[in-house]
Amino acid sequence: NVVMGGTLWQDLPSQRPSEIKHSQGKPYGAATHSVELVPGSPLHALLGQSTIGVNTRHHQAIRELAPSLAVMATSPDGLIESICLPGSRFAWGVQWHPEHMAPEDANSVKIFEAFVEACTD
């Protein structure tokens, strides 16, 4: 995002306080808040849901999105939680950690499967 012209919130707790704590403790694989998927986005198409639960371990976030990127998911407090580069094979970014959730979460597994499929096509 930044290299493409976007900006960041450098420290959410001090710059953009929220009722949602965006940095959870253990267990890291537990979903602690939801994200709303943007209808028509690749993530929405993959998961077929409007809202999913995610874990969270970040103190930075996208402030202004680069013009060439698209939002795929937002948290209830309005933070951008997932982006993509439209027209690319698989240039996605998520603020959560599907690697911690995958052992118990089918949505996380689907994200990894889509990534592997894009890499092998």
Predicted regions and their residues:
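Hydrophobic, aromatic-enriched interface-forming segments
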Residues: N1-V3
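A short helix-turn-beta junction within AAA+ P-loop NTPase domains corresponding to the substrate/partner-engaging
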Residues: G6
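Amide-donor transfer/coupling interface in amidating biosynthetic enzymes
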Residues: P13-D121
